[in-house]
């Protein structure tokens, strides 16, 4: 799946000028000259600094510097290059165009990848601190062990209803129906058979829920799944067998560990709280009133986290 390339927060010119302002105290260096007038760095800075895009680029730059100092040795150039090449291959011939549309050069995108990986590392380390018995037990309660099921995926609702009727008919050969009608390339040739538990990421949540609610050999009603783009697919699920759940959460410790870590690493509030803590520990001071609210989303997160303890 292609990972979306996020647009640069501000034009390269703005970034360069803002950076220059930070390094040149009170600079009135000309950046544009014309007949009878000039535009200085300080004039441009005064106009640009209140722009939301400029605010965002300064926030990104601050986060980059803070995480680079704290975790810079934890992310290698090789990791960054591998992630870059993965994106490049995913977009193919369109990669250069996608970068241009996002306002990014190749080097700027590599830098963005590196910053993301630094934050990901910090979030992972913070998530590991959440591996408590209490959280293991909570994850266990929500966990459903592996089931074996057969699925048929159909893109047309009318066709799906026809296949559903055939699948529920007495003596129906579900495996053959899957081979003849399913559009799911991973399971079609296997008669729709697939194994998964509640932590699986290769099966839609609605399909998992339908399977977990069935008895052996029962067939579900039509399950509708919509993509992020709103496109609907229709699933028919037959449960083949269930695995009996152990009464001891320790029996699933490795699996539950990944469940807990993944949940934290995908939780926006948790990620924000990690960034907030790093910014607080870095003792960030805002020297220009135009940027006084720059870190508000993180200071609020920090306050909320503290008050909830």
Curated annotation (Swiss-Prot):
Assigned EC number: 5.2.1.8
Known catalytic reactions: [protein]-peptidylproline (omega=180) = [protein]-peptidylproline (omega=0)
GO molecular function terms attached to this record: peptidyl-prolyl cis-trans isomerase activity
Protein name: Foldase protein PrsA
Top-level taxon in the UniProt lineage: Bacteria
Function comment: Plays a major role in protein secretion by helping the post-translocational extracellular folding of several secreted proteins.
GO cellular component: plasma membrane
Ranges of residues in domain PpiC: 144-241
Pfam families found in the cross-reference section: Rotamase (PF00639)
Entries under InterPro entries matching the protein: Foldase_PrsA, PPIase_dom_sf, PPIase_PpiC, PrsA_foldase, Trigger_fact/SurA_dom_sf
Leader peptide range in chain numbering: 1-20
GO biological process: protein folding
Main localization category: membrane
Membrane topology (UniProt): Lipid-anchor
Subcellular location(s) of the protein: Cell membrane
Organism field: Streptococcus gordonii (strain Challis / ATCC 35105 / BCRC 15272 / CH1 / DL1 / V288)
Keywords per UniProt: Cell membrane, Isomerase, Lipoprotein, Membrane, Palmitate, Rotamase, Signal
Lipidation (N-palmitoyl cysteine): 21
NCBIfam families in the record: PRK01326.1
Family statement drawn from the similarity comment of this UniProt entry: Belongs to the PrsA family.
Lipidation (S-diacylglycerol cysteine): 21
Keyword Transit peptide: no
